[in-house]
Amino acid sequence: MENFILYEEIGRGSKTVVYKGRRKGTINFVAILCTDKCKRPEITNWVRLTREIKHKNIVTFHEWYETSNHLWLVVELCTGGSLKTVIAQDENLPEDVVREFGIDLISGLHHLHKLGILFCDISPRKILLEGPGTLKFSNFCLAKVEGENLEEFFALVAAEEGGGDNGENVLKKSMKSRVKGSPVYTAPEVVRGADFSISSDLWSLGCLLYEMFSGKPPFFSESISELTEKILCEDPLPPIPKDSSRPKASSDFINLLDGLLQRDPQKRLTWTRLLQHSFWKKAFAGADQESSVEDLSLSRNTMECSGPQDSKELLQNSQSRQAKGHKSGQPLGHSFRLENPTEFRPKSTLEGQLNESMFLLSSRPTPRTSTAVEVSPGEDMTHCSPQKTSPLTKITSGHLSQQDLESQMRELIYTDSDLVVTPIIDNPKIMKQPPVKFDAKILHLPTYSVDKLLFLKDQDWNDFLQQVCSQIDSTEKSMGASRAKLNLLCYLCVVAGHQEVATRLLHSPLFQLLIQHLRIAPNWDIRAKVAHVIGLLASHTAELQENTPVVEAIVLLTELIRENFRNSKLKQCLLPTLGELIYLVATQEEKKKNPRECWAVPLAAYTVLMRCLREGEERVVNHMAAKIIENVCTTFSAQSQGFITGEIGPILWYLFRHSTADSLRITAVSALCRITRHSPTAFQNVIEKVGLNSVINSLASAICKVQQYMLTLFAAMLSCGIHLQRLIQEKGFVSTIIRLLDSPSTCIRAKAFLVLLYILIYNREMLLLSCQARLVMYIERDSRKTTPGKEQQSGNEYLSKCLDLLICHIVQELPRILGDILNSLANVSGRKHPSTVQVKQLKLCLPLMPVVLHLVTSQVFRPQVVTEEFLFSYGTILSHIKSVDSGETNIDGAIGLTASEEFIKITLSAFEAIIQYPILLKDYRSTVVDYILPPLVSLVQSQNVEWRLFSLRLLSETTSLLVNQEFGDGKEKASVDSDSNLLALIRDVLLPQYEHILLEPDPVPAYALKLLVAMTEHNPTFTRLVEESKLIPLIFEVTLEHQESILGNTMQSVIALLSNLVACKDSNMELLYEQGLVSHICNLLTETATLCLDVDNKNNNEMAAPLLFSLLDILHSMLTYTSGIVRLALQAQKSGSGEDPQAAEDLLLLNRPLTDLISLLIPLLPNEDPEIFDVSSKCLSILVQLYGGENPDSLSPENVEIFAHLLTSKEDPKEQKLLLRILRRMITSNEKHLESLKNAGSLLRALERLAPGSGSFADSAVAPLALEILQAVGH
């Protein structure tokens, strides 16, 4: 089995979360639905219908898994959101778009119907868009094979489910209500009670087309009864787009909608007529013309189901179809059946139970998508929209006092998901009950449906009620009479599942009659069924009137349970009803906000329930009692206070630890969690009885809900200060909490952040342990997943609130940490032997320095913690480090040599992290120059080689960044001041040390030279400082020592520095020449050019190219300087000013070795880099102007070929003219070169092409030059 990586959450429902995911080891992205196990029937249905369907308009199923807590469905990822979102955003769509979308819908639906599948619940939220705009049917939870009973299918799957289901919600409605979809798109015949059909799907399709065009469905009302009446009785209005500027609907479209929205299914469009409709403009011309309702429908004989046995036949394994080689296009209804649901399971039952960790939550940021994949019927997903603002730039504004912080934290301890209430009665997690059925034939009164009962007139209702009471009150003289009464009670069980009906029955005389029969009925079967009816009425009623005798029923039930306490079966019948009644009273009292004497629950009821929790009872009884406590303690009422005793916590904990059924364990810890909400001592009693370690170990549970409730309990404990000192000192506890940050559950991660915040508030030292356990990484990951705004999902919103508070606290804590470090260092400043108290303070504070490093390297914290105050404090710490390094202060004896060195290293590393973001230096330039750079400069003199190198590297990189920054908005003056301070600092403190620094082993000279490069590049004054500091000889000495590794960092810095010095107008060139500039440049240029011309080593070519360009730049500056001096001397000679030309002659003599470079410069001319050609040709031109053709190899055969190639390939007249002038100067100054040219056939031909009269289009300035050269050689 393969694991999956989960990225961001892209959809959410009440019981389902949808993630964008990726199969580990591949680049295939998928949608992964994580759903509670209570949705097993729906998910199983989806899988059995779609697992072999491959169609462009149907979301592809890949595979499914079952883990300890959830079902996981892996399907095709659709990145365009849902059709519901599109309609909501655009309000209405143009008719052309409706046609395009409609073609996709019809293609997909037609394919499903050909397979014998009815979608049954077509709505915009179940239609997804792929990136290019293709519509796809998704969420087949309520789809079915034509003719089957989906309710029975669900019941069969649910019956096969084991007791270890860990989903958080138990079904609140019956199977019948569970298989109902959205009524807005339901066909009239289905509303009346008929089964779904092809025709009803086509009605829904018509509603969808109508809504796309007009922006609203054809029938809509907030009231279900009003909506039903509209669907059954009214005709839809013609569709009108919301945007009045858009064209009205065409006659073809109106005709199409009229055909699809016929109330009589016999008159509705069939597939044949639909595909041939003119609205589609022959888009389905190639479709199967035999497609008709009759062809598509499956025989009722084949699919008929009359009872549970037939329902099992409907569940037949689709592998049989594969074995028989089923033909494409043939109705496949029978192929979706399962003979035995255990043969059709997600991956886990065959391979052993899987752990939730197979779905790993990614910590890598990914762009959000707006994919929407919805699951449960009736569930509205909250879809993520693309991020508009990055949460990483979110700053927690303002200072939050600890009182305000803890106040906000207390509000976050309990969430809605901690207080979910599920039914006590008919709860399949507690005990699976057979479906309640009644026989209408022996029911001696009208068999009204729930919908019919809702619309009965008062007189009819009273008549109905009288008949019911009469039959219940009748004596049971025979077995038949008893069966009839039981049948009637079964009927009441069915209708009591509806809220309005239950409310009316509870407040009718029937309720008093039921209590009476519960007390006196001789038949215990009837008593049990009466109790069941009472429980269902209590569970579903919406209001409770004060005169309703619920307390009488509670007292009676308590007495019956107490009198028959050894009868476990009887307790199992009566306890759920007792619990529902107490919970009903508690909720009503909470609504009324003050206790009612008439609703006071007797103490005996609490006593009975506590007895039912004890060891030795059957687990079902334990579970029922725990569920009652869980529900009642969700409320703030007098009833919940009755359960708060000294023994309740340990009893529930015993159930949690010793039960084998996960559902009971979850209920027990959930009940404990809710009791602790009223009285934290309940959990305190648990810790004192079983020990803190045992309780902490329960956080490692594989059940997500248990982890969630345990985190809630610990947060509640910490908020009250109970066991505070023990918990905040327990490193194992902190490590366990941080491990929970890997959970795929948003709620668990949020609560883990909240618990950590409580710990960090009271124990700052745990921040270091948390950072070492990757807390900052977890914060960054979840910060990417939380975006501010209304569109934020509830789970992410909760996570965002917890994260914001944690980030706010850590940001506010950092200055305190730095303050403590500064105080501890200030107290020992200048002392060789710190006192015991000072040693203790150092040991406590200095180890927290890594926290600073963790925060400044975080993109979440860095913008918030790096402030002017922070940099000032940091600079002060560096000053203390300087004192420690120089020996003025001794902390080695206090904390140890290793700890001292680690402290210094981390401090320097923190600034290294800051300078990776130059904007921070720009904002606080003066603070950096005035408070951080001086101690860094002092550390360059350190005796410790590591600190000397580290500080020099930081100084070099910081200086480079500072001098490269540009300032505006009135900051120029501050910039000038800081520049002068920086210059003075380097001049007075650093440059005097360079004599030793430059002669140290690598890489020290490289960083030292890099600083000089940055300063000389942007500050001409600094060039004079370099010369005055007598660094020039040292620079050339470094050159000699490192010339063997010319591509190394040191030589690159040397060449860059020489380039700056030579290019500076104020530079003392005579000093450079005296120190051997010419010979050094000749050597360096020769070696670098050789590397560039080596065709066999491309790596060296690429590395040497920038270096070569710098050296050529230096050469060009030298030659330009020389030619300028020579020109001035010639001008003086012509004018007869009498100036001595000796200086110019000496300079020419000094530069004469540069003529050896001519034979290197010519091969560089064909270089692919135009800049190298440009500077090489300029250098060559000046050299031949100054020295003519002195180099004997200037026009060697190889060089002649290069000139010939260049004159042929270069098209720019300026470049041609420059090359020709170089040639002319060579041949006119050296007879040997003239002779060489006479024999150069290729070069002569190139010159002939450029000469006048050759038929070429040579430039007017180029042609005479070419002709002049040809004439000189006799052509």
Swiss-Prot record:
Segments passing through the bilayer: none
Enzyme class: transferase
PROSITE patterns the UniProt entry points to: PROTEIN_KINASE_DOM (PS50011)
Induction field: Up-regulated during neuronal differentiation of neuroblastoma cells treated with all-trans or 9-cis retinoic acid.
Per-repeat ranges for HEAT: 842-880, 926-964, 1025-1063, 1151-1189, 1213-1253
Any Pfam family hit: Pkinase
Region of interest (Disordered), residue spans: 299-350, 364-392
Biased composition (Basic and acidic residues): 336-348
Signal peptide (from-to): none
GO process annotations (BP): microtubule cytoskeleton organization; protein kinase C deactivation; regulation of JNK cascade; regulation of MAPK cascade; regulation of neuron migration; regulation of neuron projection development; regulation of p38MAPK cascade
Reactions this protein catalyses: L-seryl-[protein] + ATP = O-phospho-L-seryl-[protein] + ADP + H(+); L-threonyl-[protein] + ATP = O-phospho-L-threonyl-[protein] + ADP + H(+)
Protein purpose: May be involved in the remodeling of cytoskeletal components, such as alpha-tubulin, and in this way regulates neurite branching and elongation, as well as cell motility.
Disorder this protein is connected to according to its UniProt record: Various anomalies in ULK4 gene have been reported for several cases of schizophrenia, schizophrenia plus bipolar disorder and autism. ULK4 gene has been proposed to be a rare susceptibility risk factor for a range of psychiatric diseases including schizophrenia.
Family: Belongs to the protein kinase superfamily. Ser/Thr protein kinase family. APG1/unc-51/ULK1 subfamily.
UniProt domain comment: The protein kinase domain is predicted to be catalytically inactive.
Protein name per Swiss-Prot or TrEMBL: Serine/threonine-protein kinase ULK4
GN (gene name): ULK4
